[in-house]
Amino acid sequence: GTVRCPDMESLSAALDTLYGANIDYTVRKKGERQCVGFAAGFIDDAFTPHGEKLLEPVSAMLGELLLDPVTHGGRFLSSYVESEKANLIDAIRGLKNDKRDWADIRLMQEMCAGEPYSVLRLGDEETAGRITNQSLYVHGQALMASSRVEVIYCGSAEAQRVEDAVLTALAALPRGAQTALPEVQRIQAPDTPRRIVETMDVTQGKLAMGYRCSSDDYPAMVLANLIFGGTSNSKLFLNVRERLSLCYYASSSYARSKNILTVSSGVETADFERAEAEIGRQLQAVQQGDWEDWEQEGALQAIRASLLSLSDSQGALE
């Protein structure tokens, strides 16, 4: 909450006066960067009953949440921090409940051990447990003072009006020397692949594989990933899943920031080695350019459709 709206009840009431505007926090992981902030949604001025302007008051509310939080003695309220800390720890522990996601998480933790990329979006339970109301407040102030700030707006308001509203709302933002972001670590693949097997009480095994790529040709890597395992017409789907029935699912993804290609699949334990070998054969086929024209055209169509659909979502435009 804020000094003016110290709890959820008063904060919700204030947002209700803005025709149901909503504000939520964001915690994102972009490569080796953690991006935190707030996102607000509100109706356009053209649709308010009496032509009310909402950009300015919503921006002001964002400024309050960021710069005028409710505190006591120069620190956040202990009860709020302990409650949110418990929620964070529960969320971290809950990651294991989705075994598919957990296999992918463990892949990155092992494959990128010692690199910032291995850190979870939500952090780890041990670090979360050490948070106090004072340490969190101090960290927040330092974060605002030294981090790069980006403001993204999607709507009908003129750019100058948006700039004025945001600058007014953030006028008290503490700013110091901006911390330089380190270069993203690019690690060479080891000579010998590593294999890690973990046992869990599940009915369906998960096979996650990761490859460090040497090419910096991003468009080519996107196309190759789609042909390999990025669509329902891909080699993994049509061969490993459909033709050979070695996996319940099999797909690939490409992380541009780290130049890493990953495979996620669900397999029966008895089919583990066959599935692993077949996935390797399909990847080798892509590396050698062994695909049909219809496979390439299908991948290109997927790229075009994805680009054309960007304007359908404000979140995607961001």
Predicted regions and their residues:
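Second-shell loop/turn segments in exported
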Residues: 2, 46-51, 73-75, 93, ...
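Short secondary-structure capping/junction motifs at helix and strand boundaries
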Residues: 69-81
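Non-catalytic, conformational "gating/processing" segments within enzyme and secreted inhibitor domains
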Residues: 133-169
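M16 family metallopeptidases and their MPP-like homologs
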Residues: 8-64, 68, 100-123, 148-154, ...
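Hydrophobic side chains in well-ordered alpha-helices
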Residues: 58, 139, 162-165, 220, ...
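His/Glu-based metal-binding/catalytic segments typifying zinc-dependent metallopeptidases
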Residues: 1, 141, 148, 167, ...
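Short, low-order "capping/linker" segments at domain edges
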Residues: 90-94, 190-206, 304-314
